[in-house]
Each structure stands twice: as C-alpha cells, then as structure tokens.
C-alpha cells in the first residue's frame, strides 16, 4: 500500500504519531512510505528512516528540488511552504510501478483500517476526496467565482486524497499544475487545495468526510446536535481518519486544545512514547530496532 507525504522538518514528530496510529490499526499491512521533500536535512531523513523501518515499512524519500527549479514562484506567504504543493506532483515523481497512492497530511491520526478506502473503485475518476459540505455551502459561490469553477458543487479538502496515479499520468501533466500555481497566485487562499479544486473539481469521486476526514470542530457541532449518533464510541468504531485541520493543533496547544477529539492525538502520542522506552531497553540489552 503506497502512502505519500510531504512535510518539512517541523512536522516530523507529528508524522511519527500518525505513523504509529497507522501501524496499530493496520497490523497486516506493509506500507510503502514516499516522502516528497525539498532538500530536507540528511539527519532528519535518517531519523525518519529509523522510525519507519522499526515498523518494517519501506521508506522512499524523494528530493523534489530539481523538479521545481522556479520554486520561489510557488511561495504564497510565510505560512505556506513549497512542501504544500509537492503531493500534487506525485504522479510524475513516484516510481512507474505505482498505480495508486494515498496522500495524507501529517496532522492526522488513523482510527481504523484504511484497506476499504484505499482499495475502492475510482469509478473512472482521478481522485477520491472529501468535502465539508456543511461548512462550505455558504462560501461555495465565492469559491466558484474566485477559482472560475462555476459548475462545481464541491470544494474538496486535500488532507486525505486517494490518487489514481496511472490515470493521472495518462491524461494530465505536471506542467498544468505549475501553470495553475503561478497564474493564480494572487487569488490562492488555501494554496494546494485551491489548485486541486481549480484543476480537478469535476474529476473527483466524493466519499463521506464523517468517516474518512473528520474535523474535530465539525464533530463538536454534530455531537451537540445529535449525541446519540455522534459520540466517541462512534468515532472509535466507524471513523478512519481524524484531521486536525486549521490553525489550532493539539501538539501545540496541549492541555489548552479545546476540541474533544484531541484526546486521540494525545493517546497515540503516549503509545508512541511508550515504544521509545521499549526501544531504549532493547538497545541497552544489545538488540536494535
């Protein structure tokens, strides 16, 4: 199973929590981890490799600098870096034998098996993604005007995206992504997400955000309205991914993080920390990980 990530050194520790949650909920799966990066420090890559190989997964870091010679044109403002765009180029950067891949933001935890989501039929679409309709419906006309997608009914989130790599290679190009970024720089608000919707809005299969891309803020609203359905038992039994989108992050705010689903980040983080203790004991005993 092919997983694609794109982040800088600042998100390495958060990624490790996601990785541990994937391991715990997919024990029978061996992941190929592709990290698209922009000249990440060798020490950081070596550290990631040790952690990934602990789970017996394959790690393939891909330095994308040479593919983005005019990368300064991609920078929107100080909050967004080139790594935000790299996943869009995955079809043209991954090995030719890869025919599908799941892109994940690092600010996620996995709650249940990803097998069904990953192996689903694309139904001749380029992607599978989720739209927070309840949040986006008010601003959909504005997004359509801004991105010139007048017929679009959706504005898809790009935190979790299943990619039809083979079809993308056959039908689309990397050049159109670069041109979309540079030509629309003045109107991009959520850069990679805007470009994704601008280019592909009518070629995306929609899945339910309530299962595959739960936003803790929206969950809190639904839980207040219908607590019999939306509760932590439902989250633990049904939800596949919790996505800590937005500016407020549990690993930054710690005990001040106010959304209930932050508890799962802290639980997976603690379980990861416990493995560090075990690994250190193994090292002292002469075993390696």
Please state what every model-predicted region is.
Residues 1, 7, 14-17, 165-289:
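A glycosyltransferase accessory/donor-loop signature
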Residues 21-29:
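Short, acidic, metal-binding catalytic loop of nucleotide-sugar glycosyltransferases
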Residues 32-39, 129-131:
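Short internal beta-strands
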Residues 50-93:
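Active-site-proximal specificity loops/subdomain of glycosyltransferases
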Residues 101:
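Short aromatic/hydrophobic "clamp" motif used to bind/position activated sugar donors
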Residues 104:
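Catalytic metal- and UDP-sugar-binding loop of GT-A-like glycosyltransferases, i.e.
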Residues 108-142:
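Conserved donor-nucleotide/metal-binding helix-loop-beta segment in metal-dependent transferases, i.e.
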Residues 149-160:
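A recurrent flexible, glycine/aromatic-enriched loop bordering the glycosyltransferase active site
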């Amino acid at each position: 199973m092919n997983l694609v990530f794109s982040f800088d050194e600042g998100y390495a520790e958060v990624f490790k929590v996601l990785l541990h949650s994937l391991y715990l909920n997919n024990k029978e799966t061996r992941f190929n981890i592709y990290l698209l990066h922009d000249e990440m420090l060798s020490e950081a890559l070596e550290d990631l490799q040790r952690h990934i190989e602990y789970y017996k997964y394959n790690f393939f870091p891909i330095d994308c600098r040479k593919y983005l010679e005019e990368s300064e044109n991609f920078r929107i403002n100080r909050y967004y870096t080139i790594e935000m765009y790299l996943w869009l180029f995955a079809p043209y950067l991954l090995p030719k034998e890869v025919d599908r891949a799941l892109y994940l933001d690092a600010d996620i935890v996995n709650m249940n098996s990803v097998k069904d989501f990953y192996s689903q039929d694309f139904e001749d679409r380029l992607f599978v993604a989720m739209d927070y309709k309840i949040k986006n419906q008010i601003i959909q006309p504005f997004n359509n005007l801004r991105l010139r997608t007048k017929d679009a009914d959706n504005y898809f989130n790009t935190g979790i995206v299943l990619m039809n790599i083979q079809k993308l290679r056959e039908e689309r190009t990397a050049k159109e992504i670069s041109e979309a970024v540079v030509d629309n720089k003045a109107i991009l608000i959520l850069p990679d997400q805007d470009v994704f919707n601008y280019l592909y809005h009518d070629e995306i299969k929609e899945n339910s955000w309530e299962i595959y891309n739960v936003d803790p803020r929206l969950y809190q609203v639904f839980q207040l309205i219908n607590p019999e359905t939306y509760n932590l038992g439902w989250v633990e039994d049904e939800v596949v991914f919790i996505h800590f989108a937005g500016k407020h992050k549990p690993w930054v705010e710690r005990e001040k993080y106010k959304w209930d689903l932050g508890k799962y980040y802290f639980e997976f983080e603690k379980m990861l920390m416990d493995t560090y203790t075990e690994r250190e004991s193994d090292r002292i005993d002469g075993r390696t990980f």
